[in-house]
Amino acid sequence: MSSAPDPPTVKKEPLKEKNFENPGLRGAHTTTLFRAVNPELFIKPNKPVMAFGLVTLSLCVAYIGYLHATQENRKDLYEAIDSEGHRYMRRKTSKWD
């Protein structure tokens, strides 16, 4: 009657999969070609560069809007020359008004 000691209770932790260590595309199995073609999916975002790009893009859109607004105003104007030879801008008028 040999009494074997009771085996110690071992708590088994759930197995961690590799996909859960790195969430998103960084943990996904991809080819080298896919990583080379799409590096922005795997590189940590650079917030100062993103802020600079957002400000630059916003200024470009605002400038295009400004040019569009000034072009609309110039469309109704033409350069007139009076009898003394002075040039000035005059608004086009319709013959029907």
From Swiss-Prot:
Keywords: Membrane, Transmembrane, Transmembrane helix. It comes from the Eukaryota. It is a single-pass membrane protein. Residues 1-26 are annotated as: Disordered. Residues 9-20 have a biased composition (Basic and acidic residues). InterPro entries: UPF0708 (IPR026686). The chain crosses the membrane at residues 48-67. It is found in: Membrane. Disulfide bonds: none annotated. Pfam families: DUF4500. GO terms for cellular component: membrane. Belongs to the SMIM8 family. This is Small integral membrane protein 8. It comes from Mus musculus (Mouse). The gene is Smim8.
